[in-house]
Amino acid sequence: MPAVGFCGEWFIFTCDKKLVAIHTKQARESFVFDCSTAEKKPNNTKDVSNGDGGASEETGSDKVLAFAVSPSGNLVALTDDSKRLVLFHCEPSWQCISIRWVVRRCTSLMFNQAEDQLLATDKSGDVYSFSVGEPQREGELKMGHLSMLLAMSMSPDDKFIITADRDEKIRVSHLRSPYNIQSFCLGHQQFVSALLVPPGHPHWLLSGSGDGTMKLWDYESGRKLQSWDLKEHEETSSSEADKQKKPTVCRISCSPDARHVAVQCERASTVHFFTVDQDGEEKLVPHRRLSLPHCPLDMTFDPEGQLWVLMDSGDAPLQIYTHRRDSWESDAESPELIRVTEAFKPHWETLEASLRTDSRFEHLYKVNFDNVAAYLQKKQQRLEEQLKRGGGHRRPTATRRPEHNGCNKVILLNGHRDISC
C-alpha cells in the first residue's frame, strides 16, 4: 500500500519498491531510492526459520513495507519485504547512511524523540532497537508479544513505548525496561491498526481499530476517555453488505498546531475531522466529514497544517485541503501541489492499479465459527435415539443410596460417580 509523509519541506511517498522525496518549496532535484537495486543480503547473514523448523521466509520482492521520519525531520528510515532496514539523512542533501538487516519483516518503524534509537516492530510480535549513532550496529531485542504487532507510538518524553497488536490489546511499557508494563488499554473488539499521541497532549493516546471505532485514552492509567463509532458518521449506504461492514481505521493524523485530528478509514471515500474542545475539560469533538472524489490511500499534514491526501486516481492522485472559514477546502492551484504532482506522476503511472489498493487488514479479522448449534442438534438426535432404544422410558440421571463410610449419598450424574459427605 502506498504511503505519504513529510520530512521538513520534503514530501515523501513510497510506491511499490521506491521511496521518492520531492521538495515542496524549491526546484531541487528529487531523491529516489529503489530497493530493487540496493545492496543484497550477504550470504553469511543468519536467516530465521519458521516455527516448524522449516525453511526461512520466502525471498522478498523488495516492496517497501514502512517508513518513518525523525522528530527533527533530518532522518528517514525505511524497511522492505527483503528485510532491509535503510537509514538516510536528508539535509543538507539526501544520503544513505546504512543498510542493515532485520530478523523478520517489519510492520512499523519509529524514531524516539532523542533520535538515538530507531525502533522496529515485526510480524512475530518483537520490537528491536537499532542505534542511530552507530549505523552499522545490529539491532537489540527490546520486547516481545504473543501476537503480530500492527502499530507503535511513544510518549514525548521517551519514557513509554506503546504497542498495538492483532489481539485487540494496547500495551504501555517503560522504554528503558520494557518488561515493566505500565498499563493496558483494553476495549477494542478487533485488531488495533493505528496509534497516535497527539502533539500538545502528551498524556493522550488515540487508537483506531478494525472494529470501526476510534478511542481516546489516558494511556498511563489505561483509562478510556472517549469513543466514537465511525460507522455512525458515514452516509447511509444503499448496499446491505456495506451496512454490515465495519470501516477499518488505517490512519490517524494530527495537525502541527494540535487543533485538528484527521481519521482515514480503509476503502471509504471520506475523511473524518475532530477538533479539540477547550471549554472546560479538554476533549475531542467530531467536527466535519470531508467527502473525497476517490478513496484515499494515505494522508498527512504538512508543516503548515495543510492536509495532503493520496487517492486511488490516475488523473489527480494528490490533493491538498486547507482549513478556511471552519471548513476544509481543496486547493488545486497550489504551487506546491503542482510542483509535487509533476515529479510524482511518472512514478505513480508505472504502478499497477491493483497494487494501489492492496488491503493490509483483510486477513486480520477474526473468523467466528458457530459450532454450538450443530452440537446441540447432534445432542438432541442422540437423546431421541436413546429414548427409542429404551422403549420410550428414559433412565433416571440420579440415584441415591446410603454409604457405610460416613457419607450421606452417592449421586450418579451422566455416568459419573459423585460422593457428597
Task: Cite the ranges covered by each PLM segment.
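Canonical WD40 repeat/beta-propeller blade segments in eukaryotic WD-repeat proteins
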Residues: M1-A3, E58-A68, R104-F111, S147-S153, ...
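Intrinsically disordered, low-complexity acidic/Ser/Thr/Pro-rich linker and tail segments
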Residues: M1-L65, S70, A353, T357-S420
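Short coil/turn segments that connect the beta-strands within blades of beta-propeller domains
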Residues: G8-E9, S72-N74, A114-D116, D157-K159, ...
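Conserved strand-to-loop turn within each blade of WD40 beta-propeller repeats
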Residues: C15, T79-S82, T121-S124, T163-D167, ...
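Per-blade loop-tip surfaces of WD-repeat and WD-like beta-propellers in eukaryotic adaptors/scaffolds
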Residues: H23-S30, A38, K46-G51, S82-V103, ...
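Eukaryotic helix-linker segments that join adjacent hydrophobic helices
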Residues: C35, P42-L65, V69-V102, T107, ...
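Contiguous mid-protein beta-loop-alpha structural module that forms a pocket-lining wall or clamp
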Residues: F191, H201-T213
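Terminal intrinsically disordered, low-complexity extensions flanking WD-repeat/beta-propeller proteins
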Residues: K224-C421
